Each structure stands twice: as structure tokens, then as C-alpha cells.
Amino acid sequence: EDVIMVTDPAYGPVAGTTDTLQMLRKIWPSLKTARMIGSSALSISYVAAGRMDIFVHHRLQPYDQAAGLILMEEAGGLVTDREGNRAQLYSDGLIASSSIIHQQFMEITKHLQWRKPSSRSLNPRER
């Protein structure tokens, strides 16, 4: 494929880093390349602009994704959590892409630990 993925395994040895690396290993044959830009907001913006094809992240803070959610929606893209539900500010993980690429990604990763929800909510009202 000619798919360019943007991701970031997060800083340091945090929960989800190993799962992200496992996900990359599984999806690598379907990619042209993968990039780590270092800014989730910029990465999502690149997907919205069509410069990259898919952005995935295990766990983001609301401030990391707020602008990207709007940009992707306005660009006609699809943004979901790791389970495939429409993304919200406190979503558990993020997948941003076109609907076709999203469907392919979800199929390839359906049995991976990366797709399972985290036990800790990011929403301060639920802690």
C-alpha cells in the first residue's frame, strides 16, 4: 500500500508503549512508511490536510487532540477511539483517517492488545 502512518509510542515506559510497538509490527507490511513527528496536534493536522493517511495513538490528553478532532471533522475524515466509537475529548486512544483506511486498520488490528480499552479514564469527572 501507499499508506503513511503517523504514531507515537508515548514518552518513556508507560502503559501502551509495548502494545503500540506490537501494533506497528502487525500493520507494517500494509504501510509505505510510519512517522513519529512528536506533536499529536500537528500529526492529526497532517492527516486532515491529506499529507499523511492515518494517525493512531494509544492515549492522548484532551489538549493533544481538541483541535485535531475539529480539523478532521471539517475535512470529512473519521476519528474514533480504539474500539471504533466516535472520538470525544476524553476518548481512550485515537485513530484518525479516511473511512476506507480506518476500516482496513480496524480489521488488521482487531485481535491486538492495542485495541483493548484502558482501565483508567482521562475524564477528571470519572476518576
Residue ranges of each PLM-predicted region?
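An extended, acidic
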Residues: 1-127
